[in-house]
């Protein structure tokens, strides 16, 4: 199976649609005008011909999404267990057709569930409440991060949201190197999908993506903590707050969770020993 770059385009407007809208400003109701609206499409992840999940997502960087989802959901342990991917149009949406190793495919069939997502719902398709949450090996304490370098990352986070700049409708996830520089990032209408894209990209990049932390433009849910931990990410920064379950999961799996990240301040929820404050 050939690994195609279906999602690579030359213009960000390929991921937006012009719609006629009415703009209201105080004491002024303006006539209908054209504005950009972010695209959101159903994306099916199909493993060895069997559809496993349908998620609502932005139609770009989908091979990174498929790789990140496969890793963060425990379908694979290594990118080498995926032999190839094709992104193809399907009825009213897109399919990522994934060639999965036989051993991993047998495991997937054994625990397969009907998971229908709404921009990345972690509970959709889970049959019992006891099934929520996956066992995650406690993370090592091999990383540190100087909080004095976080401001640089925050300043440039929206550089990875070209669609968001046009529409105000996407979340971002980026990889922060210890220097505070951003190695790369992705955007999506779904915050979990944006993170999966980042995790998939990280798994196939070089050594510079091994050190550092993940930064998301949204709140931190338990699933985002769990996905990060499943992929070996030790530090997760979020621009907004964390939920109680996210904090509990982060505490159990030794992940350093930091929320309300703003220039010059942050709220450290768990495992502050990885952080250096100048």
Curated annotation (Swiss-Prot):
Pfam families: FdhD-NarQ. GO terms for molecular function: sulfur carrier activity; sulfurtransferase activity. It comes from the Bacteria. Mo-bis(molybdopterin guanine dinucleotide) binds at residues 260-265. It is found in: Cytoplasm. The active site is at 121 (cysteine persulfide intermediate). One of its GO terms (cellular component) is cytoplasm. One of its GO terms (biological process) is Mo-molybdopterin cofactor biosynthetic process. Keywords: Cytoplasm, Molybdenum cofactor biosynthesis. Its main location: cytoplasm. Belongs to the FdhD family. Required for formate dehydrogenase (FDH) activity. Acts as a sulfur carrier protein that transfers sulfur from IscS to the molybdenum cofactor prior to its insertion into FDH. This is Sulfur carrier protein FdhD. It comes from Salmonella paratyphi C (strain RKS4594). The gene is fdhD.
